[in-house]
Amino acid sequence: MAKAPKRAFVCNECGADYPRWQGQCSACHAWNTITEVRLAASPTVARNERLSGYAGSAGVSKVQKLSDISLEELPRFSTGFKEFDRVLGGGVVPGSAILIGGNPGAGKSTLLLQTLCKLAEQMKTLYVTGEESLQQVAMRAHRLGLPTANLNMLSETSIEQICLIAEEEQPKLMVIDSIQVMHMADIQSSPGSVAQVRETAAYLTRFAKTRGVAIVMVGHVTKDGSLAGPKVLEHCIDCSVLLDGDADSRFRTLRSHKNRFGAVNELGVFAMTEQGLREVSNPSAIFLSRGDEVTSGSSVMVVWEGTRPLLVEIQALVDHSMMANPRRVAVGLEQNRLAILLAVLHRHGGLQMSDQDVFVNVVGGVKVTETSADLALLLAMVSSLRDRPLPQDLVVFGEVGLAGEIRPVPSGQERISEAAKHGFRRAIVPAANVPKKPPEGMLVFGVKKLADALSVFDDL
């Protein structure tokens, strides 16, 4: 008599599993997200054998002293894109598992195809496609004018078969496009389900560690822009990056959200052209492409992205509201942060906007999360309210507290130096960030309170 297939109940939100169904997940506290998954033992490969092969640890494990472990830096190889290397922490580490996500049409497959075509001339690579046919990939490579003579292609969705072929080919870098269409034979659920995504990602990660193959997995995203699939998917990989960009903009930003071999929140900027993605070596010049006409409601701030400063322009529009509840719209900034700053401006700046619609936008599609943009945002709103432009050679940064104090931000000297390189001659910064020796030809105003910043603005 055949044994009944094993059953498990898995949460679709976080990937936690349970022996029986329950209404609420105990891990993420979400309701009605637990579904049944049937598991059947593989008829040809025992579990211990499978774990000790492609997905398991090679050889016999042994205990080692931490002091005996070599401290030599892991060797890296370049992707051929300096911006991509920057986001990865300096290049690709052999044996690492990388997950790249992004909206449909952002350019994930294009970026990886360009990368592998460049690297195929120097080392052995393998591009595994599960969503497109080989003819479709070849047509895109031909349209972009990429060298394809040395690139190895494979159209397959079975993880076991892919690892068998990779064992024979022994590539240095392998791309899986995408992880949501891959499946394992001993998991009786459809590709893209929580169980399939979790097990296939873990299988590939262990294969990368034991064989020294760098694997890049393409992942889908949800409606809110986060990576689809269980959270355990992001836990088991070494590096998670997200390729983002508006549909009406040709610029794409690549940002690292997790990196075991480098800095997180590192930013790389690309431009989508007819020849594919091209890296932008000086992003500040693009985000600051302003016209000669001076307009109110515009200010320039210096944000810190990963390991480098970036100059971006923030725009604000304050107009009389025709509705009982004025609108507050923030694009590229946190909505709650805008509400806090409006309250601080009313309480400590004496300017109330309760009857005004307020719209703010970060130019270029950049998403700013750090609080160093507070002071620039406030001055942009005041500029729009008074219809008085800020000087074009003025740069602003600083955090604003609830008591109206201007708090210092990290790397103040580097931010000021970056602004001076781009021709800015005046700066309003926190008093604690004023350098002992400002850049030549630059006038730096240090402020401690919001009232001080408004006073400097009046005197400009």
From Swiss-Prot:
The UniProt record lists the keyword Hydrolase: yes
Chain segments carrying region Lon-protease-like: 357-460
SUPFAM superfamilies: P-loop containing nucleoside triphosphate hydrolases, Ribosomal protein S5 domain 2-like
HAMAP family listed in its UniProt record: RadA_bact
Residues where ATP binds: G102, N103, P104, G105, A106, G107, K108, S109
GO biological process, one term: recombinational repair
Zn finger region (C4-type): 11-28
Listed SMART domains: AAA (SM00382)
GO molecular function: ATP binding; ATP hydrolysis activity; ATP-dependent DNA damage sensor activity; damaged DNA binding; zinc ion binding
NCBIfam families assigned to the protein according to its UniProt record, in alphabetical order: sms
Cystine connections: none
Coiled coil start-end: none
Domain notes: Has a putative N-terminal zinc-finger, a middle region with homology to RecA with ATPase motifs including the RadA KNRFG motif, while the C-terminus is homologous to Lon protease.
Keywords of this entry: ATP-binding, DNA damage, DNA repair, DNA-binding, Hydrolase, Metal-binding, Nucleotide-binding, Stress response, Zinc, Zinc-finger
Pfam family, one: ChlI
Family matches, as PROSITE patterns: RECA_2
EC numbers for this chain: 3.6.4.-
Role of this protein: DNA-dependent ATPase involved in processing of recombination intermediates, plays a role in repairing DNA breaks. Stimulates the branch migration of RecA-mediated strand transfer reactions, allowing the 3' invading strand to extend heteroduplex DNA faster. Binds ssDNA in the presence of ADP but not other nucleotides, has ATPase activity that is stimulated by ssDNA and various branched DNA structures, but inhibited by SSB. Does not have RecA's homology-searching function.
Record protein name field: DNA repair protein RadA
Top-rank EC class of the record's enzyme: hydrolase
Family stated for the protein in its record: Belongs to the RecA family. RadA subfamily.
Locus of motif RadA KNRFG motif: 258-262
